[in-house]
């Protein structure tokens, strides 16, 4: 897998899983709506979403999963300008795809 697709998939899964659980807990028509332990579900799911994203993207790209992280690494000299552009573009596309799919599910 290329670094571009690793960042895309990692960011996609991060946003899809994290926002999916928030949607499931917050939206009134779902089974988890109004559950007093909902904050535990949300925080645990976001932690797992980060873990899943890192496991998927880590071996191929370092699992930045955020354009701000990639920018900081570029400013530090750890990424080239081409890598920064590729990573940031993949992350933005992955975030948009994960959020859009979540929107259509809920």
Where are these regions (language model features)?
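Membrane-interface helix-loop junctions and terminal tails of multi-pass membrane proteins
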Residues: 1-106
């Amino acid at each position: 897998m290329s670094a571009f697709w690793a960042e895309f998939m990692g960011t996609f899964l991060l946003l899809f899983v994290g926002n999916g659980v928030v949607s499931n807990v917050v939206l009134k028509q779902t089974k988890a709506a109004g559950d007093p332990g909902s904050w535990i579900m949300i925080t645990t799911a976001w932690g797992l979403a980060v873990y899943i994203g890192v496991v998927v993207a880590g071996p191929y790209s370092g699992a930045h999963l955020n354009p701000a992280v990639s920018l900081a690494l570029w400013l530090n000299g750890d990424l080239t300008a081409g890598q920064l552009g590729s990573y940031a573009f993949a992350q933005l596309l992955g975030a948009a795809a994960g959020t859009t799919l979540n929107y259509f599910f809920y």
